[in-house]
Amino acid sequence: MSRKEAILEVARELFNEVGTQSSTTNHIAKAMGISPGNLHYHYKNREEIVRLLYINMRKETRLPIDELPKCITTLHEHEKLLIAVQWKYRFFFKEMLSLLTRDSELEDLYIKDNIAHRRRIRQVMNNLIINEELIITDEEDLDFIVDSISLSWQFYSSFLHTIGEELDATTVQNVIKYTSAAMKPYLKKREN
């Protein structure tokens, strides 16, 4: 692992532990055992570090269009991968709106990615319809399901925090229940 990669890893761990607001580049340098100047040789500021962590997270979750889930089983398998990555970068979901407000470059990148992600969720839903796992004939219903799934994935961590629930590696997995509930009324009935 290169020094640059090690700095990102230490920063991610620190952000997850105490949050980005409590983690200056000086804190990251201290946790790395390097001087602040050495850290700044690699990264201009904390926002650049957060932005690069976001880009790394995005790379870990993105599937090529032709590999998007085509059935409920593979969708659930993919959701488990997404949960693991979301837990790994949990600081981002907990502080998303604040992070986007502090860094317009990150905000622009996230909005662009979020629009693309919404299209990808819609493609997954279309795959499930084509493969007769879901029956959705109304475009408005399809948009509602796509948005419900997107909202669940993006804001579940924040939601837990606002109701006093502890977020841990187990509770974060409950987001799958919300995505499943959004699709449940449209599941094709299977004959026994």
What does each model-found stretch correspond to?
Residues 87-108, 123, 158:
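Amphipathic alpha-helical segments used for helix-helix packing
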Residues 76, 80, 139-150, 154:
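Short, well-structured alpha-helical segments
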Residues 123-126, 152-192:
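C-terminal peripheral helix-coil segments that are non-catalytic and often amphipathic
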Residues 117-146, 163-164:
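Hydrophobic alpha-helical bundle segments that form small-molecule/ligand-binding pockets
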Residues 6, 10, 14-48, 52:
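Helix-turn-helix
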Residues 55-61:
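Short, basic, alpha-helical segments at the C-terminal edge of helix-turn-helix-like DNA-binding modules
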Residues 65-91, 146:
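Hydrophobic alpha-helical connector segments
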Residues 1-4:
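Short, Lys/Arg-enriched anionic-surface-contact patches
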